[in-house]
Every structure is written in C-alpha cells, then in structure tokens.
Amino acid sequence: MTNTKGKRRGTRYMFSRPFRKHGVVPLATYMRIYKKGDIVDIKGMGTVQKGMPHKCYHGKTGRVYNVTQHAVGIVVNKQVKGKILAKRINVRIEHIKHSKSRDSFLKRVKENDQKKKEAKEKGTWVQLKRQPAPPREAHFVRTNGKEPELLEPIPYEFMA
C-alpha cells in the first residue's frame, strides 16, 4: 500500500478512547471554565470529531488566548525544521483540560509567602530556594561477624 497523507494518518491508538470509557462524553468536560491566560493540555478525543486538533498538537501544552461559546483559541509552540513557531489553533473544549504543570509552582509560591510572613514576624532569615538532597550521613555497616570480601577485576589475558 502507498503512504497516505490523511489528517488522521497514524492515529489508530492516539484518538481511541480508553477501555470502558467509550460512549457519551461526561458533562464535567463541558462544565470546566477556561479563561484567558490558562495553561491547558491538548488531548484529542475521538468521540467528538468537530474542533479536533491536528495530531501534531496531541499531548502539547499551550496558553488560552481566546474563548468562544464552544471552543478556545490556544497558543502552542510547534517545531518546524530548525525553528520553533508559536501557532494559534482553535480547539473545542472536549479536546483540552487544565494543565497540572503549574500546580507545584503555585503551591511553592504560597508556601514561600507563608514562610516569609513568619520570618518577618520573628525577624529571622529564611531559605526559600529549593536545595538539592544532601549526601547521606555517615554510618557503620554491620557485618554480623563475617569478614568483608575484597573484589578485584580479573586481569586481561590475550588468547591467540
């Protein structure tokens, strides 16, 4: 067979619904509120063919720049050969969901504000930057009366 050039070529598993999730789309999908500036994940839903994003945007994260009755406009970065372009696409809300990529950052901002407030009241300095995990503390290894065994590599022998 020849290599077809259809819009949905190679999407047999990409746009298929998960096991036991076929049929009517849950109403919660339509009840979600999207505002300008929201960060959303694009994931095509095969149940709804209208307003489906192209397969190249599947799994990408973008920012909402426009909201209409049934769809939203999203700015997504797309790599075209050597350059990254900011593409503006219109996608129906069935094919997007709020991204969790910013949740950890926003949680950290709240915690840092709380730490700053407490430190200001006490008049102390507080470390706000995340620190890498330090090396483990020194400790003794129990051998249970057994002598440690010395391991060394076998010397190389050339066999002709």
Swiss-Prot record:
Location of this chain's protein in the cell: Cytoplasm, Cytosol; Cytoplasm; Endoplasmic reticulum
Pfam families xrefs: Ribosomal_L21e (PF01157)
GO molecular function: RNA binding; structural constituent of ribosome
Bias kind Basic and acidic residues: ranges: 112-123, 136-145
Keywords annotated in UniProt: Cytoplasm, Disease variant, Endoplasmic reticulum, Hypotrichosis, Ribonucleoprotein, Ribosomal protein
First and last residue of the signal peptide: none
GO terms under cellular component: cytoplasm; cytosol; cytosolic large ribosomal subunit; cytosolic ribosome; endoplasmic reticulum; membrane; synapse
InterPro entries linked: Ribosomal_eL21 (IPR001147), Ribosomal_eL21_CS (IPR018259), Ribosomal_eL21_sf (IPR036948), Translation_prot_SH3-like_sf (IPR008991)
Subunit structure: Component of the large ribosomal subunit.
Family label: Belongs to the eukaryotic ribosomal protein eL21 family.
Disease: Hypotrichosis 12: A form of hypotrichosis, a condition characterized by the presence of less than the normal amount of hair and abnormal hair follicles and shafts, which are thin and atrophic. The extent of scalp and body hair involvement can be very variable, within as well as between families. HYPT12 patients have normal scalp hair density at birth. Hair loss begins during the first 6 months of life and gradually progresses to nearly complete loss of scalp hair. The remaining hairs grow slowly and are thin, sparse, dry, and fragile.
Role according to the record: Component of the large ribosomal subunit. The ribosome is a large ribonucleoprotein complex responsible for the synthesis of proteins in the cell.
Protein name: Large ribosomal subunit protein eL21
Naturally occurring in which organism (per UniProt): Homo sapiens
Gene: RPL21
